[in-house]
Amino acid sequence: MLWFNRNFEVPHRLRAIVRARESSVIVLAALAGAMAGLVVAGMGAAVAFMHLQLFGIEPGARLSGQLTLNPLAALLVPSLGGLLLGLATTTIARWRGSEVDPVEANALHGGRMSMRGSLIVAAQTVWSSGVGASVGLEAGYTQLASGIASKIGQAFRLRRGDMRMLVGCGAAGAIAGAFGAPLGGAFYGFELIIGSYAVASLAPVGMAALLGYLTAQLFTPDRLGIDTGTLSTLALHDILIAGGLGLIAAGFGILLMRGVAACELLFAKARVRPVIRPMLGGILVGLLALVSPQVMSSGHGALHLTGIFKLPIAAIATIFALKALASIVSLGSGFRGGLFFASLLLGALGGQMFATGMNALWPSLALNPDAYAIIGMSALSVAVIGGPLTMTFIALETTGDLWLTTAVLIAVILSMQVTREFFGYSFTTWRFHLRGETIRGAADVGWIRDLTVAQMMRADVRTTPVEADVAAFRQAFPLGSTNQVIAVDEDGRYAGMVLVAEAHAAELPSVTPLREILHHAAHVVLPQMTAQEAIAAFGKFEAEALAVVDSVERRQVLGLLSEAHTLRRFSDASERQRRELLGEM
């Protein structure tokens, strides 16, 4: 398609219309949502075809919904598939482009994503799930759908705020299509990809979610939502008990996310070559699948397996433990995908076990295991991905039960708060943290990083030799000519700063060397520093202005930056960002 070409731009007249009319952005959002629905249908069909060919399951069946698997296929397909993935990843490493996640794109890059990188991530996700690795397709769905939306925005040269919103529209359409939940998809876009709610974004994101849902349903014959069975009415005490389940889900979610990082560290410490790590992970997943086929792929099919929640609690606990281990090993060994789908199955199984255990201890409670499967599913997913309203609306659209949704809301709020308090990350931002990024969500902080000292400094600085005396300085820089003058040595290196008013003080002898009245000789800022870092430096050094040097070692003067100018530029940028967020620009 034309917008896959990074050099493609639509004609100027059409771009002008889109930038001038809000309704035009809604049209682009609808297009992004429809494309997201096609992405969901296409990737789902590709994975289903791989399962059909590689594992020999019946057409229309789901891999994780199988009661038994061919032992040879269960062992060989994930291991050989992992080996091929490792070889392919190593081969394409030089030209795959930047793989920018939608959250990272909106937080740091103003919504700009690489189409090539998004296609590769989507292909790796399809392959990983297709060969049976315990990974979720949602990562590939949102990556490719958001990448297409970003490319549409780049073709129309949308403003930064509109670009970020359109990326959120792509993700919203993908999640709405994947779960059959347009409201849940819309709030996924708001909470996790855009990072905020705004009236101006409601129509575009809502339209994208609706089109994503309708398109996916049109091209996918079976329902992609979650089957829950029949739910009975909840009692008042269920609301309170749901909060306890939310706390437990938060703790397990933290362990699950840390487990993936620990698995990666274990492979690294064992000095296992990255090219063969997926193969080793595939072998272990295959062994686990011999015990329970529900551990394979995303686990979406297991949620459709009507009898899974009717199994004895020991069997449910076994599936729960094996699925958690398979997910940790799959992601930790290098398979591509997400943890969202796995957390749905794990949370549902955990909720069932929780309700069954409580009923065994206190039969008078008469908890409904099916209802607690929904509560546990929502609470664990929020601990892993964030987005409390996303999961609340998915639960509502799945069950149509407002009373149950109230219990879900209590559970997800507590789960989210405990996870934020004791861990501080979702699975996505935890991965960013492990590679050195400091972002905690999709809120736009890229403008802060873009506003650097190099952009704000004055390059036309006035300097004076540090060997001069006060008399020579007074003659060269009369009172009122400037506020500060930078002193440099014979090699042009920064030596300190002279305050003009202080140098002209009557009580200061004219023969005084400038070296005796230098300020901030050891205090400088660097051109790559952000405005926030510069403001912190002014406060730390108690300076009204600081010299800008090329490096701490060379100390060649590049310019001068004042605190007042920095604060003004930062305030202007903040106000511009606020207006974009509210749709005033």
Where are these regions (language model features)?
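Alpha-helical transmembrane segments and immediately membrane-proximal extracytoplasmic
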Residues: 1-450, 454, 459-460, 464-476, ...
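Short, intrinsically disordered terminal tails adjacent to the first/last structured region
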Residues: 1-5, 551-552, 580-585
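Short hydrophobic beta-strand motif reused across regulatory alpha/beta modules
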Residues: 187, 393, 495-503, 558-566
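Ordered, small/hydrophobic-rich secondary-structure cores
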Residues: 351-357, 505-507, 519
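Bateman (tandem CBS) regulatory domains
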Residues: 438, 448-462, 468, 496-499, ...
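The conserved cystathionine-beta-synthase
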Residues: 464-482, 488-489, 505-510, 524-551, ...
